[in-house]
Amino acid sequence: MEILIVGVAVVALMVFVSTKIKKSAAAAYQPETIETEEFKIYKPEGFIHPLNDDSGLAFVANSKEWGKNEASKFRQAKAVVRVISNSDFKIVCENAKKSSGKVKSKQFVKSAPVGQKIFLLEGETTEADVKIITFWEIIESGKKIYELKIAVLETYAEDFAERINAMTASFNVK
C-alpha cells in the first residue's frame, strides 16, 4: 500500500513539473522587447532568445521550427546583432554586401537620426543547396557599428515577412 501511495505521489510530482516546464518553454517563444544599454529590439512570437548564449553576439533569436527535407539542419529564421567597435562603417557595409550573395536591394537611409548612419541590405545566398534570404540593418552610432542580420529560409520568407518587418522596424540604437 505504501508503494502505491509513493507511486501516486511521484506521478503527481512528475505531472506538476512537466506542466511547469511546458509553460516556461511556451512563454520563451512569446513576443518581447529586448533592451540593452546600447540598443532595443522586438523579438516576435515564435522566436527564442537564449539567455546563456556564448556566441559572443549581442543578440540572438532563433525560430522555434526547423526547415524540412534538405533544409532540416537550418532554423526557419534566425536573427543576430553584432556590435563592432574597431572598424569603418563603409567596410562593414561592403562586407555585408559580399556575404549576402546576390544583392536584391540596398540603400543608405537618408532620414537617419542625428549622429547615425544606417544601411539596409537584402540578399539571397545558397548554403548546402538551401536558398536563404538575408536582411541586414547596419547602424553606425558614435564609435560603434551595430549589425542586425536576419536570415530566413526562402521557403518560409512569406510566413516570416511580418515578423521580420517588426524586428527591423524596432531595431533602435540608443
Regions found by a protein language model. Name each.
Residues 42, 112-120, 168-174:
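Short flexible/disordered coil segments
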Residues 38, 83-87, 162:
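Residue-level detector of secondary-structure boundary/capping sites
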Residues 1-27:
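N-terminal signal-anchor transmembrane alpha helix of single-pass membrane proteins
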Residues 16-18, 39, 146, 160:
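Aromatic side chains
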Residues 25-58:
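N-terminal "mature-domain start" segment
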Residues 45-47, 144-174:
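Surface-exposed amphipathic alpha-helical segments
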Residues 39-42, 140, 163:
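Structural motif
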Residues 50-147, 152, 156:
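Conserved polar/disulfide-associated segments of primarily extracytoplasmic proteins
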